Amino acid sequence: HQPDVVLATPLADCGPYQTDYTKSAQRLGLPVGFVPFSWDNLTNRGLIRIAPDRVLVWNEHQKREAVTFHGVPEDRVVVAGAARFEDFFAMQPSASRADFCARAGLDPSRPILLYLCSSNFVAPDEVSFVRRWMCAIRTAADPALAPSGIIVRPHPAHPEPWHGVDLGRVENTTIWSDEAKIQADPGLYDSLYHSAAVVGLNTSAMIEAGILGKP
């Protein structure tokens, strides 16, 4: 292989292997670009140990983070947008509301609330929290809110806490997701598209919710 350029992501991580790629590429005279995969890659994962030739950040906030926290020369940092979400912007729902609700086991006549679960690092005991939240929804004084359908979508990297959890005593609820994909996930898109509102603690899927204009 004789590449023209090497692109690395997430690079600013806990492990060193992508730093080795950067060192090797630069030794061979190949330009190296770094594309942050997620919004928090420059603030809570690790350091950029060797500055790439270009850092293609999402926005001015990430540009400041790259320069301030990682010491990347400002002239190497380019605001290029969030490449990860390009495909998501172009997506369309794969199912009608009736078909989606039939798959998820929900009443299509009711509005849907989507709960997006977080990683174990953020929410180590999310099951008990979600149960309390669902109880608050069902006992709400608002007659439109209380009977809403509820989808609990486990975090794709941390589904284990929801294995075997039974929400059967709470009507019109489901723990549901299609086979998860890292990006351009059609199951996530459909869940967001057909929901009236989205709830979560701290997960990148809130960005996808914002793309679809969901409160």
Predicted regions and their residues:
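Structural motif
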Residues: 4-5, 54, 112, 149, ...
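Active-site and donor-binding regions of nucleotide-sugar-utilizing enzymes
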Residues: 1-94, 158-159, 183, 206
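Hydrophobic anchor at the start of a short beta-strand
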Residues: 32-33, 150, 214-215
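Short amphipathic alpha-helical segments and helix-helix/interface helices
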Residues: 19-22, 45, 130, 134-138, ...
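Redox-cofactor binding/interface segments in oxidoreductases and associated redox assembly factors
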Residues: 8, 57, 115, 152, ...
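Conserved catalytic-core segment of nucleotide-activated headgroup transferases in glycan assembly
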Residues: 85-178
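Donor nucleotide-activated moiety binding/catalytic core segment of transferases
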Residues: 157-207, 211-212
